[in-house]
Amino acid sequence: AGIAALQETRSEMKSRILIAPGFSQHKAVADALIAVAQKTRAIAVIDGPNTNDEAAIDYRAQFGSDRAYIVDPWLVVRARDGSEQLEPPSARVAGLIAQSDAERGFWFSPSNQVVTGVLRPARPVSWAINDPNTQANYLNEFSVATFVSHDGIRLWGNRTCATDSRWAFLSVRRTADMINESLVKAHLWAVDRNITRTYVEEVTEMVNAYLRQLKAQAAILGGRCWADPELNTAQAIADGRVYFDFDFTAPYPAEHIVFRSHLVGDYLEEIL
């Protein structure tokens, strides 16, 4: 009942990042979070089992939603009494995503950002910038986000639990959600207006202006809105229905950067 209540919040206060710290490592709780996320255009940050890599991968395999983002292991933090204690990662990851949204924009991945207030991951996760055969990359390969130690404790992982590769990246999923939500909110004025040529042109241009603004911010690579005449038939308009299509291309995170080294003798002639 508590998780279901998240979908009852007012539209201007909708939660875009859903968590149940210390509970979402249980599948029933995670499923409930994902169900609400699906209805509210949110993402659910899911705590992993915090045992070993294989258990984390097995847990991730139980989900097939582009709105689920699984993080493992848990984190070790300093308690108020000075002792060390385990903490499920979802709350700090949610805070990191919100911070990234505010400082950089919703179209950026939260991966490779430092998680503050953390001593270390609950178990060591091997990682090296020039080594693909590490635990961190192994977990990422199976769409489990994790933490690596490099100038702080960093969140490491871009991928949701999507079965459709178009929505594999968390930042792409969230970019689509934010665009859809923004357009719906911005066009409340258009509901119940008379459907005229001017009306169709005005709505289309407002959407295109918004997409141009996003492109100028590098939030998308491009986009376009149009009113499809095959859908906007005389009968549809007579029934009070009008259709606006739009497309866009989201930027994709540089998950793997490959530098290829070539030793050549071509520049020897520059000696003289």
What are these regions (language model features)?
Residues 168-230:
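Acidic, low-complexity glycine/serine/threonine-rich segments
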Residues 231-272:
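C-terminal edge-of-domain segments
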Residues 1-185, 224, 228:
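A glycine- and small-residue-enriched flexible loop/hinge signal that marks low-structured segments
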Residues 41-46, 174, 207, 249-252, ...:
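Glycine-rich loops and low-complexity Gly/Arg-rich segments
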Residues 32-34, 203, 224-226, 240, ...:
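Composition- and surface-driven signal marking solvent-exposed, interaction-prone regions
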